[in-house]
């Protein structure tokens, strides 16, 4: 793992790195635990929540979060996430204007609801070179207390697509995979499944809750 530089405008220490295997190289985003700013409402080890978000996305079959693994790097243990070569002029507030992205954004919305994402800024939705939208910066998820802060309220009050309901039901019925369970506390696991069950049963995106439901800054 070779450090290429520190990413600007990140609350926690976040680095662009180059990783290699068998002669092949790729860029990745490295978030070491040592670089995390202490929070009163989240325990240390936010990088594990980045990992958990990836495994939840995979368990649902949605593929929203770039490949994320746990690695020992120059600044210690942390998460290593595949770098998205995105069009950084695009973010949620621009992407939501294109009907072609609606299904993908609806899944990100549902994902944030059950993961209890406390920080879904517009800039955390990236448009990849293949036209696929990715959800990044998922470290403030899975709190047992209501923490939802998101800019994605365009679906408020709308029926939940049946495909999303089916995936949520499947998750609840099968339970969490060991790779995901190992990253969360018992109450966090139970709350995650409870939120998924409630959303599937309700069958509708919740209505907007007011100003406190938005992260700051929004982009």
Q: Model regions: which residues?
A:
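Conserved ATP-binding subdomain of kinase catalytic cores across diverse folds
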Residues: 1-101, 105-118, 122-123, 129-138
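C-terminal catalytic region of ATP-dependent kinase domains
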Residues: 6, 20, 43, 128-219
């Amino acid at each position: 793992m070779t450090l290429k530089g520190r990413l600007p405008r990140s609350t926690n220490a976040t680095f662009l790195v180059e990783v290699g295997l068998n002669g092949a190289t790729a860029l990745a985003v490295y978030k070491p635990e040592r670089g995390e700013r202490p929070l009163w409402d989240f325990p240390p080890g936010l990088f594990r929540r980045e990992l958990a978000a990836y495994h939840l996305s995979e368990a649902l079959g949605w593929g929203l979060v770039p490949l994320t693994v746990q690695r020992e790097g120059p600044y210690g243990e942390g998460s290593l996430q595949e770098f998205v070569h995105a069009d950084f002029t695009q973010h949620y507030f621009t992407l939501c204007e294109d009907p072609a992205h609606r299904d993908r954004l609806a899944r990100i919305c549902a994902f944030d609801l059950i993961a209890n994402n406390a920080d879904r800024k517009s800039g955390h939705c990236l448009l990849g070179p293949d036209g696929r939208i990715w959800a990044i910066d998922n470290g403030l998820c899975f709190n047992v207390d209501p923490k939802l802060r998101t800019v994605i309220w365009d679906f408020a009050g709308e029926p939940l697509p049946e495909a999303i309901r089916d995936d949520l039901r499947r998750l609840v019925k099968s339970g969490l995979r060991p790779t995901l369970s190992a990253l969360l506390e018992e109450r966090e696991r139970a709350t995650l499944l409870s939120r998924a069950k409630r959303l599937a049963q309700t069958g509708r995106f919740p209505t907007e809750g007011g100003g406190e439901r938005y992260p700051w800054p929004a982009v």
